[in-house]
Amino acid sequence: MKTIEVFKTNVLNKNAAKVILEEIGMHQPEYKCNFDLEDCDKVLRIENTSGRVNAKLIFEILEKNNYQGAILE
């Protein structure tokens, strides 16, 4: 089951986005993820081809790096 989650974040720059993406990859290497920092919501898009996206983990990683996120519906 393929799942895609899109998160609104307050990540503002490419360096911070890179750090967060690397940390997500360390915890969940099967996730395909990217940021769209041009979007007004500073979107983080995550795809998991083998199940659900662990939103709790994503929130924890964002918060650990002093950022916030919310799932876009």
List each language-model region with its residue ranges.
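Short amphipathic alpha-helices in soluble, non-transmembrane regions
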Residues: 20-24, 56-64
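Short loop or secondary-structure boundary microenvironments that flank
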Residues: 10-13, 48
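RNA-recognition motif
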Residues: 34-40
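Helix N-cap motif at beta-to-alpha junctions
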Residues: 49-53
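Surface-exposed aromatic
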Residues: 40-46
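Short amphipathic alpha-helix segments
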Residues: 12-28
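Short glycine-/aliphatic-rich beta-strand segments at the starts of folded cytosolic domains
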Residues: 1-11
